[in-house]
Each structure stands twice: as C-alpha cells, then as structure tokens.
C-alpha cells in the first residue's frame, strides 16, 4: 500500500512510452512494509492487452538492533602458539526478519590477537577470522567487538511499520559504546579500551552488558545508530592447571578415599578459562598392589589366665575390605582396617583347625563418570571472578573400583600441542 512507481509517491495510473526496442522501463519505490508486489501494464491502443509482473517483492531493510548476532566456530583458542584461529560469523536481519541487503559491512576490533577488520554480507551473513598472536592479555580473556550501521529496535505503537519519534517506543536504547576489555560493564579510559563516539545525545541508555556495551547518558530518540555486539574468547595454555575439589587434596597429590573423587582443569593458573577447545581428558588406573592375606586362630586368656575365647586374626589383607575366612565347614567375615589387618573376636574356645582365607585380588579400575571427555568448541566464560566456581565445562568426577594403597590413578590431558599426565599414588 505504500509502494510508489514512476515517480516517488505516485500511486495512480500513468502512461509511459516504450523505447526504440519496444521496452517500457518503470522505476519502483519500495515503501516501509515487506511483501509481494504486482505491477500491471496495459496497452493504450488496446486495453484488452495487459501483462502482470512476476517475482517482484519488497523484502529487506537495514539491520536492526535485535537482528544482529554473532557466532563462532570455537571460543577457546591455543595461546601457546601463533596461528590458532576461530571463525566468527555475523548474522544480520531487518526488523521483519529478512536478511539485510548484500554488501552490508560490519567492522570488528579485538582486545588480543588479530582479527579481520570487516566483512560484507551475502544473504545476511559474513565471517571474519580471529587469530592467536601478540598482543596476549594477561588474564587470557579476549573481548571481540563487532559494530555496524543500523536501526534501533522499537515497538511500533501506531502499527505503520515506521518509527515515529515520541510515538513509538525504543527498546534498550543505545548510544556510544566501547570494547569492555576487563568485563566490568564500564568504560575505563585508563585501560585504553576502544571507544566509539558518535552520538550527541544526553538521554539515559539501557544498562551496559557484555553482549551489548553502552556508555551511560549518550542516547537520543533517533532511530539510526551504530549497533554493536561483543563476544568473549579464551587464549588458553596447553599446560593444564589442576584443582582438587573433593576426595582429593587441592594440589591433586593425594586421594583421601578409595571410591570417588572430583577435580577441575583450567587453561590458566588464575583458573579463569577452560583448556583449548578440542582438548581431551582421560583417566586410567595401574594396580600396583598384590595382597596375600593370612588368617590365624588365636586363643585369648580370660580373667584367670585361662583361655576362654578365640579370635580369628587376618593380616596382609587389602585395606578397607571384608575378608571371607573358611574354618572347617563354616565361614567367617572379618572387616579389614586401613592398615591391612582385622580381628573377629569372641569365638568359642573349643574352635579348632586352620583357617583359610578365600580371597581374589581385585584389579584397580578408574573411569570418568561426569565431565567433558573433549573440551567443547563453545563454552560460557562467565566472568573472570566467577568462572572457576560456576563453570561445569571444567569439572570432572572419577569413580574408582577395587583400588588400594600403592595403586596409581593417572589423569591424561591431551591438548592440541601437548600431553600432560598427573599420577596420584593411593
């Protein structure tokens, strides 16, 4: 209904002459609403002859604030070498969900490494490459900021598909912006954070966030803006940082029980990032213990020094187990302490014979029962302060079976360029 033709604003029938080749060329002026368009041409000399246009539609506009998104092939790169890369894809749509016009250009800046400065869209998307190299931020966390000319998101109160100032409502108004290198949602000039100033506005803005940095009180009520979107990346070491959580000490040198333990693996010593994407984690056990328990029947003297009971005593057994002892045609069960010995007291003084231990040495086994066996391509990096406590992508639990003193548990971290093992002897 808002399309015009031949001249801007015209919606009435017009007569147009053909060129020497018999062609009639008509200029169309799209309006503000998307949809199919049909143009009818009728021969003046014979109005029974007419034709309708085909495959004409109004479909694209400028990228809108909530139509800009970023994705990445991975977000934890190898910091120990130059040249590890991640592909970052910008997807852009207008407020009606249509891809923006081909050739829309979006720019990128990065806190660390190097990044392709811009890309131009085809069918609403384009991609750039983030590459590890100097500079390398000390906290191994890299902010990447993308920005593009577009329109703010708004609620179309009057339903005309056009933003009308003081009638329609802007969603999450945005003004000037910055690259939030230290992730505190504030612009810090002393850190040399990248800043983009264009607005002369003084109105309040939406709160700044990691995904959409915003400088307070730089907004206006206009529709056009420089849209922005920020992502976080980790530049992670191939050398893991271990941290014991439960069932093992924090330094991962001693396991306190023989069943389960849990730990975390980080990509830097500050425990603020995961290992590089694609790193694998495995666990194995080595059985170094071979127990040969022996049982004895020992008399116990009463108050008068005369034996009145007997004990079944087991030694050289596997700690913290229960041993089955056969004596004559009966079976007795002896609980073994941590030192490998156990005593079953209070047996009859008339009990005789040679007790025999029925025991099979069990092999030590270990398996990861929770945690990523391969570090994912995409993970939440949370905040520098909270990552070590809340990230599930760095947490692992191990179940042990049949393990005893002197057995070894080996954790193997296979990063893209390095293999690290941590062996814990029980």
Tell where the protein language model's regions lie, with residue ranges.
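The feature marks long extracellular or luminal low-complexity segments
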Residues: 1-426
């Amino acid at each position: 209904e808002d399309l015009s033709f031949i001249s801007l604003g015209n919606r009435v029938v017009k007569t147009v002459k053909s060129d020497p080749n018999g062609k009639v060329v008509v200029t169309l002026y799209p309006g503000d609403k998307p949809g199919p368009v049909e143009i009818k041409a009728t021969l003046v000399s014979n109005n029974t002859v007419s034709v309708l246009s085909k495959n004409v539609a109004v479909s694209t506009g400028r990228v809108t604030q909530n139509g800009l998104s970023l994705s990445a092939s991975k977000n934890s790169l190898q910091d120990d070498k130059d040249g590890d890369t991640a592909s970052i894809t910008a997807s852009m749509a207008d407020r009606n969900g249509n891809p923006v016009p081909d050739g829309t250009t979006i720019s990128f800046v990065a806190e660390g490494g190097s990044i392709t400065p811009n890309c131009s869209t085809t069918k609403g998307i384009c991609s750039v490459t983030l590459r590890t190299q100097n500079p390398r931020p000390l906290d191994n966390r890299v902010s990447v900021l993308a920005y593009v000319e577009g329109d703010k998101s708004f609620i179309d109160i009057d339903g005309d598909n056009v933003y009308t100032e003081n009638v329609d409502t802007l969603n999450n108004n945005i003004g000037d912006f910055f690259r939030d290198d230290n992730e505190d949602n504030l612009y810090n000039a002393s850190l040399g954070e990248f800043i983009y100033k264009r607005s002369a506005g003084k109105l309040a803005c939406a709160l700044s966030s990691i995904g959409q940095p915003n400088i307070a009180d730089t907004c206006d009520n206009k529709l056009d803006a420089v849209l922005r979107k920020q992502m976080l990346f980790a530049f992670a070491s191939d050398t893991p940082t271990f941290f014991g959580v439960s069932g093992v000490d924090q330094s991962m040198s001693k396991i306190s029980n023989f069943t389960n333990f849990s730990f975390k693996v980080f990509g830097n010593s500050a425990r603020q990032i995961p290992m590089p994407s694609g790193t694998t984690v495995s666990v194995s056990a080595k059985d170094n213990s071979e127990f040969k328990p022996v049982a004895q029947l020992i008399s116990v003297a009463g108050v008068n020094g005369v034996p009145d009971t007997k004990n079944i005593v087991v030694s050289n057994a596997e700690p913290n187990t229960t041993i089955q002892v056969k004596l004559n045609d009966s079976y007795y069960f002896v609980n073994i302490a941590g030192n490998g010995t156990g005593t079953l007291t209070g047996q009859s003084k008339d009990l005789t014979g040679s007790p025999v231990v029925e025991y099979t040495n069990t092999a030590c086994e270990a398996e990861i029962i929770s945690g990523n066996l391969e570090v994912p391509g995409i993970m939440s990096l949370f905040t520098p302060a909270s990552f070590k406590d809340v990230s599930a992508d760095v947490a692992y639990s191990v179940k042990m079976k049949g393990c005893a003193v002197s057995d070894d548990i080996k954790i193997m971290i296979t990063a893209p360029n390095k293999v690290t093992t941590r062996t814990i002897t029980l």
